[in-house]
Amino acid sequence: MFTRDMTIASFDPDLWTAMQGETQRQEEHIELIASENYTSPRVMEAQGSALTNKYAEGYPNKRYYGGCEYVDVVEQLAIDRAKELFGADYANVQPHSGSQANAAVYMALCKPGDVILGMSLAHGGHLTHGASVSFSGRIYKAVQYGLNPETGEIDYEEVAKLARENKPKMIVAGFSAYSRVIDWERFRAIADEVGAYLFVDMAHIAGLVAAGVYPSPVQIADVTTTTTHKTLGGPRGGLILAKANEELEKKLNFAVFPESQGGPLMHVIAAKAVCFKEAMTDEFKQYQAQVVKNARVMADTFIQRGYDIVSGGTDDHLFLVDLIKKDITGKDADAALGRANITVNKNAVPNDPRSPFVTSGLRIGTPAITRRGMGEVEAKELTDWICDVLDDIENEETIQRVKQQVLELCKKFPVYKG
């Protein structure tokens, strides 16, 4: 029998200590990993609810288990809100992650061995866009496009050329490390020319799209997927969206359940519903606009301090710092900044001469610092501190000075007040 006063702290102190350590780390470190964000206590409340106890294979009003009358309401709320938020005609809120959402799209629309055309991981794409180590590059014949070496932007002429030569079943647009606005209509035209599906993975920019500060692909692509964390700031999970197409909707639903997943995570779906409602507020729209402003200030400050930024700037929430000319590895830069309580991630830059485990760049994003309430003043200040460390990554005195400055800034802008 359970009682409401049961706690992890009293039952499992080892686990509790690690959990509290992570909470403290989040409060005392500056988070600049582009794919990370802080979620609201409301989202966490939903994830810790009794909904975690309920099995609900199937879809609302079409379940394989009894007792689903309340989880049906929960899932339908999430579906309806996702459709309203993104202007979609169809939404599936069951994918456990962005990668699983992508896998379901491939299974719904492609057969093993079909050609897919996606952005190279080395140029800013995602593992699931055809990387050789991913299922997407093993089950399907993946052809990869990249960036124009002169501009650092997507080479649409190359995309069109590869599409004409390889006749892909599906063209994948989207990224995990790209700082410019993608021309969705250009991709649509290329896909139509060769008779391919257009699949957009907007996992990184979904919050920006929801707020109207980045163009929406939802009514342009055949299918769009996203995660519900990152810029959306919700729970860790996936989402599939599409414009009206009854045959396509049936294929997508089947690909999620029963083809690739069993029971949905109802507590996470409830948290997605909360997240979608939060994203409809004016406060959220203002937040997303500030995310972009902060990213631009940071990119501009790096350039002023003598650092190269891939494509020369940013139009979204992230950018890549190219450290090749500085003769610093991404791995060493990541480690030095970590000692100063600044969390970034090493990242390959286009045509990177170093291995993916070392790299020559850093990926930096602003969703988390903006969520804490930081604006352009703090963004510039932070960038100057980062550059101070990178200018001499062996200087522990500078690292410790910056760490103290970071701790003071974190106290001023707590993640969770009270």
UniProtKB/Swiss-Prot annotation:
This is Serine hydroxymethyltransferase 2. Its main location: cytoplasm. Catalyzes the reversible interconversion of serine and glycine with tetrahydrofolate (THF) serving as the one-carbon carrier. This reaction serves as the major source of one-carbon groups required for the biosynthesis of purines, thymidylate, methionine, and other important biomolecules. Also exhibits THF-independent aldolase activity toward beta-hydroxyamino acids, producing glycine and aldehydes, via a retro-aldol mechanism. PANTHER family: SERINE HYDROXYMETHYLTRANSFERASE. Coiled coil: none annotated. It comes from Hahella chejuensis (strain KCTC 2396). It comes from the Bacteria. One of its GO terms (molecular function) is glycine hydroxymethyltransferase activity. Its EC number is 2.1.2.1. It is an enzyme of class 2 (transferase). Pathway: One-carbon metabolism; tetrahydrofolate interconversion; Amino-acid biosynthesis; glycine biosynthesis; glycine from L-serine: step 1/1. One of its GO terms (cellular component) is cytosol. Its cofactor is pyridoxal 5'-phosphate. (6S)-5,6,7,8-tetrahydrofolate binds at residues 121, 125-127, 355-357. The gene is glyA2. The keyword Amino-acid biosynthesis applies. PROSITE patterns: SHMT. Disulfide bonds: none annotated. The modification N6-(pyridoxal phosphate)lysine is found at residue 230. It catalyses: (6R)-5,10-methylene-5,6,7,8-tetrahydrofolate + glycine + H2O = (6S)-5,6,7,8-tetrahydrofolate + L-serine. Belongs to the SHMT family. It is found in: Cytoplasm.
